[in-house]
Amino acid sequence: MLSCNSANADYLFHKERASYDGSLDVGDKTLQCGRVIDIMKLWTYFKGNGWKQIAEQVENEHKLALYVKDYVIAHPDRYELVVPEVDTFNVCFWYKPVEMDRKNYKSEEEYLQLLSKVTVLAKKYMIDEGKLLVGYSSSKSPYYFWRTVTSNPYNTNEDMDFKMKLIGEYCEQAFKELMTK
């Protein structure tokens, strides 16, 4: 079943899972995750909603992604865009902990390696606490960053503010733990 349905989407279902129980990522083992079922989901959604409502929802999701991008830009001391242009529902960024000053690291590589560790550990805190679930990615680079996707038609700007604030809290907690090791 896994070999038939798996998309092997490393950007969604992280293979390393060093910091949390990988059995929670069951999506790659299900029929619903495969591309085969996507057209059926789209057709059913279209029949129930029509083009106008779908267009409004897509536009709203894109506006929310742009809102997150603007949030990151408005807080350059804490956030940094990885991909400056947002033309989808994905926003890729790093959270920079308060006490983590780029000038204190010998190289950019050392700095980004620590940001990656902070991201992965913060994801563990998210899963353990269960308040929020945001993915991270590496986009074929050795460094992990946050990859948030706006895909809930009921989300608001306030929900995005909450998400970004919580990401910051988890990252601050992760940084402190990493510095005490």
Regions found by a protein language model. Name each.
Residues 37, 56-63, 67, 86, ...:
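Generic recognition of stable, solvent-exposed alpha-helical segments in well-folded globular domains
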Residues 1-75:
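Active-site C-terminal subdomain of aminotransferase-like
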Residues 80-86, 134-139, 181:
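Short beta-strand
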Residues 48-52, 99, 152-157:
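A generic structural motif
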Residues 72-82, 176-181:
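Surface-exposed helix-capping loop/turn segments at secondary-structure junctions
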Residues 105-108, 138-181:
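PLP-dependent enzyme catalytic core of the Aspartate aminotransferase-like
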Residues 81-126:
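Conserved PLP-binding catalytic core of the aspartate aminotransferase-like
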Residues 44-45, 92-95, 146-151:
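Short, hydrophobic beta-strand segments
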